[in-house]
Amino acid sequence: MTTTIRSGRLSSWESFCNWVTSTNNRIYVGWFGVLMVPTLLAAAICFTIAFIAAPPVDIDGIREPVAGSFLYGNNIISGAVVPSSNAIGLHFYPIWEAASVDEWLYNGGPYQLVVFHFLIGICCWLGRQWELSYRLGMRPWICVAYSAPLSAAFAVFLIYPVGQGSFSDGMPLGISGTFNFMLVFQAEHNILMHPFHMIGVAGMFGGSLFSAMHGSLVTSSLIRETTETESQNYGYKFGQEEETYNIVAAHGYFGRLIFQYASFNNSRSLHFFLAAWPVICIWITSLGISTMAFNLNGFNFNQSVLDAQGRVVPTWADVLNRSNLGMEVMHERNAHNFPLDLAAAESTPVALIAPAIG
C-alpha cells in the first residue's frame, strides 16, 4: 500500500486563491473583484484624464467638434467626456482601430473606453456582492437591489445608443451633459408622458418618503436605556439581541395616524417593502428607457382638443408639445435635422408662381 503525504506548504496559486476568497480581509476581493478592480481603475483613470485634457470631439460627425474638458474652457458644471462621434456609429472603436491617437481622440474614443470598462466593472461589483453574501451564508437580496441602478446604467449607456444607432446618442459623462441628455430625451421621446417613467418617479419619491417615515418612526420609538442627560444612542450596543425600538408603539402610532392596515406589524415584511418598492420601480423605468431606445415613445397628444366650432381648446398637452419642439430644434442645430413633427405638415408655398430662369 502506497501512502502519499502532501507537503504542508501551499503553492503560490493556492495562496492566491485563499487570499481572494477569504472573508477575513479588511476589504473582500473575490473572483469578481479580480476583474472589477482593473476595469474600474481603467475607467476612472481615463475619465479623469479626458475630463481634464481631452481635445474637442466631433460628436455629430459634421466636422464641428464640441469641447468638454477643463483645458478647453470648461468648468466642473459644463465639463464632460463627450460621446464618440456619429461617424463611428455603433462600431467598436478601441485605440488600435484608429489611424492615430489624434484621430481616436477627435472621434471620441475615450468615451467608449470609459463606458465599456465602467459597465464591466459595475457588473463585477454586483457579482462580488453576491459572492460575499454566499461566503457569509447570507441571502442574496443585496445584489438583487443593486441590479436596479445597474439596469439604469445599461439602459442609458448601452441599450439606448444601440437602439438609436450610434454611441453619440449615449449620455455624456458630465453634469450639464446629463441634463442635455434628459432634455433631448424628452424632446425626442416624450418620456414625461411614458407610464414607466411615471412609475420610476413614484419609486424615487415614494422610496424617499418611506425611508424618512421609517427612520423617524424608529427614532421616535426607541427603548430608553440611558438617563435624561445622556444621548439615547448610548443605549444601543453593537450586536445586542434585544430590539432597540418598540415596533408595537410605532405600529400603533402610524395605524392611528392613517388607518390600521397602512402600518406593518411585521418587521421583516416592512423591510422587504422598503427595499422592493424603489428597486422594482427603477427596473420598470429602465425597461421604459430600453423601449424608447427603439422609438416606442411616451403618449403624445399631437392633435389639439377642438370645440364644436373647431377652435382649439388650450391644454397642457399643447404646452408640452411646443416645449418638445423647441428643445428638438435646438438640439444638433447645425446637423440640419429638422423635427419630423414640423416637417410632416403640409408645405407652405412662398411664391405663387415659380420665377422663370433665363
From Swiss-Prot:
Membrane topology: Multi-pass membrane protein
Gene: psbA1
Pro-piece positions: 344-358
Species classification: Bacteria, Bacillati, Cyanobacteriota, Cyanophyceae, Synechococcales
Protein name according to UniProt: Photosystem II protein D1
Function according to Swiss-Prot or TrEMBL: Photosystem II (PSII) is a light-driven water:plastoquinone oxidoreductase that uses light energy to abstract electrons from H(2)O, generating O(2) and a proton gradient subsequently used for ATP formation. It consists of a core antenna complex that captures photons, and an electron transfer chain that converts photonic excitation into a charge separation. The D1/D2 (PsbA/PsbD) reaction center heterodimer binds P680, the primary electron donor of PSII as well as several subsequent electron acceptors.
Transmembrane segments: 28-45, 117-132, 141-155, 196-217, 273-287
Enzyme type, top EC level: oxidoreductase
Site positions (Tyrosine radical intermediate): Y160
Any Pfam family: Photo_RC
Miscellaneous remark of the record: Cyanobacteria usually contain more than 2 copies of the psbA gene. 2 of the reaction center chlorophylls (ChlD1 and ChlD2) are entirely coordinated by water.
Subcellular localization, as worded in the UniProt entry: Cellular thylakoid membrane
Stretch forming the signal peptide: none
